[in-house]
Amino acid sequence: MGDVRDRPVRDRWGMTDQPFRFSSRSSRRALALLGGCALLGAVSTPAAAQSPGHGRWVGTWAAGVTAVPDRAPGYPDGRIAYVEDQTVRQVVHTSVGGDALTLRLSNEHGDEALRLGAVHVAARAGAGGTDIDPATDRTVTFGGNRAVTLAAGTRIVSDPVALDVAPDADLVISLYLPGRTEVSTVHQYALQVNAVADGDVTGARTVTPVAAPEQWMFLSGVSVRARTRTSAVVALGDSLSDGVTTTAGANHRWPDLLSDRLRAGRSPDLGVANVGIAGNRLLHDPNPPAGQPVEAYAAYFGPSALHRFERDVLGQPGAEHVIVLLGANDLGQPGSSAPVAETVTAGQLIQGHRRLIARAHARGLKIYGGTVTPLKGAQFGFWSEEIEAKRQAVNRWIRTSGAYDAVIDFDAAVRDPAQPLRLRPDYDGGDHIHLNDAGAQAMAMAVPLRLLR
C-alpha cells in the first residue's frame, strides 16, 4: 500500500516551510527573464510505496513546487486563483516506464486543507490536448479511499495503481476539487496547456475547458514500478533546467533531451526527475524588495536549493545521481529581484555547493557539478565585471577542486567561441541568458552518459 499519511514539510533542521506570500503578480515573460538558472527544496516522502511485485519504484516525472504570489489588481495574467466543483486535468511526460504507478500530491504551501473528491490517471489520447484513452483510465486511491484530504503544509503518495506506463509518453492526471479551493501550490512553468473543467469529469474522455492554465497544480511527482533494476537522475537547477524559453508542449528542456539520449543508448531504464525552478537560488529563498514589481512573482522562485534538497533530491524515489546547475540567480538577482544585502561572494557559493555535495554523499548519491553558463548581455542586471569574476571563480572551483564526483561543463557547451562571456547566438532564447531548443540540446549532449550507467 502507498504511504498515505499527511506529512508536515520540514527541512533538515526541523523547520517547517511556510508559504511565501507577496503582494502582486506579473507576466510569464517577466518571470522568465529573471529566472536565471536554479532549483530544489524541503523533505518529501522518501520512496513510493513498495507494493508486492517485482521491480523497483523510481521517479519517472517530477516538478519542484512553490507558493503562489498573492493576487492583486492589475495583473490579469491568467492564473487560476480558485477552483470550486471543478476538475483540474494535467499532462505530464514520462521518462521511464513500468507496470504500476503512484502519484505525489502536495498542499505544502496551502493555508487550508486540500480536499480531493476524486483522482484519475490515464494515458493521453493523441498528440495534443487533454483527451484520455478510456481503456487506460484508472481511479487513484489513498489508503483505499477515492477521496482524500491533505492538511495545510502536507503532501501525500497514492496507493499503487496497476497501469502499463510507457516511457517517453504522456499521462493525464485529473483532480476533482468539490469545494472552493485556493490554488496555492504550483509549478509555474509547465510549458504544457492543461485544463480546468466544471464538475467531476475525472473519468471523461474529453472535457470542455473553462480555463487552460500553463501550470501544474498540487502535483509534484509520478513514480513507476520499473520492470528492471533501475534508478533515477535528478536535475536540480533554475530556469535553464526548467526550460522557460524552449518550445511549449515539445518536452525540449535539457533534462527531457537527456532522457531521450539515455533511452537511445545503454541506459533506457533510467528515470529523469527535473526539479528545476525558474528563479531559484542556491543560498537564499525569495526576498523581493518591497514595493517593486518583482513582488508580483518572486514566490514562484521557490525555496533555496539548500532548503529543498531533502524534498526534491533525496526524496526522489530511486534517485542515485544528481546534476546541479545553480548560481546564476545568486549572482544576478541581488539589486534587482533580491536585496543588495543578499549579494554573495564566490566563496559563499562554493560553500553552498559543498553542503549539497556532503548531503548527497551522506545518502550514497553521486553528485555532478554543472558550470554556470554565460551571463553577459543578460537583462535585469545579471552581468557586470564583478559578477563575471565571481562566475569565473565558481566555475574554476567546480572544474578543478575534485569536490564533485564529476563535472558537466555546460558553460563550455553553450558559450560563443568568439565571445566566450556570451551565449552562442544560435543557442540564445532571446534574452541572452536562457536557451532555445538547440541550446537545450547542446546542454543535454554535454552530459557524459558513462556517469549514469
Q: Where is each model-derived feature located?
A:
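N-terminal export leaders
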Residues: 27-33
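Active-site-proximal beta-strand/loop segments in catalytic clefts of secreted hydrolases
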Residues: 106, 176, 236-239, 274-280, ...
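Conserved SGNH/GDSL esterase-like catalytic core that processes O-acyl groups on lipids
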Residues: 61, 84-90, 113, 119-128, ...
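N-terminal secretory targeting modules
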Residues: 11-15, 19, 33-236, 242-250, ...
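Catalytic His-Asp segment of secreted/periplasmic serine-dependent ester chemistry enzymes
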Residues: 281, 289-293, 302, 332, ...
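Surface-exposed amphipathic alpha-helices with a cationic face
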Residues: 353-361
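N-terminal secretory signal peptides that target proteins for export/translocation
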Residues: 1-26
